[in-house]
């Protein structure tokens, strides 16, 4: 189960984009993920597939984590979908990365005990933060060359130290068991993730409507953040 890793943190392409952005704009010099100059038709099809996948996963995550929402944490499908579209675009993660991260997410949720809820850290209630950590883990597991925490900091807007802390917590909940037989992985994707899609009833090519509204996850430069869940 090999992921298609286009850009690594130390790649020439990544460094070239950073330098070009530094010289061309006074705003945040980092463009993550790096810009690609492919055909418009290819980009449109690729973006549509990623959007459809994000819809399926966001519905699944919200179905699991919505009961954990509170005054500070909103695990609605709409909020999760906005985050997924942005983080998948910036990280250039493959479908396998995203689906495996969703598998990890469900395992972590299933490991939660009702008696332990009061002792769990607040971030564990935020579906976006937990999925981000699962995405980091799946990216490390599937790719020989993976992003550093500094790169994930650029992608997410969270501090590298916070990401490391949350990653270790997720690893503990997974008992450090990241490997899964490929047949079992495909079976889970078909019987669990795709069935969740059917329950929600979202058409595969349904357009994503994004109402313009204020969101605490955006900073002054319109960079997606996950500071407040």
UniProtKB/Swiss-Prot annotation:
| PANTHER family cross-referenced by the UniProt entry | PHO85 CYCLIN-5 (PTHR15615:SF36), PTHR15615
* Annotated Gene Ontology cellular component terms: cyclin-dependent protein kinase holoenzyme complex; nucleus
The record's comment on protein family reads:
Belongs to the cyclin family. PCL1,2 subfamily.
Give the superkingdom in one word. Answer: Eukaryota
| Stored InterPro entries | Cyclin-like_sf (IPR036915), Cyclin_N (IPR006671), Cyclin_PHO80-like (IPR013922)
| SUPFAM superfamilies assigned to the protein according to its UniProt record, in alphabetical order | Cyclin-like
Subunit organization: Forms a cyclin-CDK complex with PHO85.
**Compositionally biased spans, kind Basic and acidic residues:** 1-24
Its BP terms in the Gene Ontology are:
cell division; negative regulation of macroautophagy; regulation of protein stability
Q: What name is this protein filed under? A: PHO85 cyclin-5
Q: What induces it?
A: By transcription factor GCN4. Rapidly degraded under starvation conditions.
Region annotated Disordered, chain positions:
1-46
Q: Which UniProt keywords apply?
A: Cell cycle, Cell division, Cyclin
Q: What does this protein do?
A: Cyclin partner of the cyclin-dependent kinase (CDK) PHO85. Positively controls degradation of transcription factor GCN4 under favorable growth conditions. The PCL5-PHO85 cyclin-CDK holoenzyme phosphorylates GCN4, which is required for its degradation by the E3 ubiquitin ligase complex SCF(Cdc4). Amino acid starvation reduces PCL5-PHO85-associated GCN4 kinase activity and leads to stabilization of GCN4.
Example GO molecular function term? cyclin-dependent protein serine/threonine kinase regulator activity
């Amino acid at each position: 189960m090999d992921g298609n890793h286009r850009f690594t943190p130390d790649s020439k392409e990544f460094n070239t984009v950073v330098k070009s952005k530094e010289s061309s704009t006074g705003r945040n010099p980092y463009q993550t993920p790096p810009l690609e100059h492919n055909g418009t038709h290819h980009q449109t099809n690729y973006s549509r597939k990623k959007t459809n996948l994000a819809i399926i996963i966001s519905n699944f995550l919200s179905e699991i984590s919505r009961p954990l929402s509170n005054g500070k944490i909103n695990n609605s499908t709409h909020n999760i979908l906005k985050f997924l579209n942005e983080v998948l675009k910036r990280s250039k993660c493959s479908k396998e990365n995203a689906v495996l991260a969703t598998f990890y997410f469900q395992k972590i949720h299933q490991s939660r005990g009702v008696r332990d809820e009061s002792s769990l850290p607040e971030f564990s209630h935020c579906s976006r933060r937990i999925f981000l950590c699962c995405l980091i883990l799946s990216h490390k597991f599937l790719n020989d060359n993976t992003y550093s925490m500094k790169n994930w900091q650029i992608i997410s807007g969270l501090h590298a130290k916070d990401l490391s802390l949350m990653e270790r917590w997720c690893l503990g909940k997974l008992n450090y068991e990241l490997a899964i037989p490929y047949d079992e992985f495909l079976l889970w994707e078909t019987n669990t993730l795709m069935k969740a899609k059917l329950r929600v009833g979202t058409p595969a090519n349904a357009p994503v409507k994004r109402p313009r509204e204020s969101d605490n996850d955006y900073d002054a430069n319109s960079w997606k953040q996950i500071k407040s869940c």
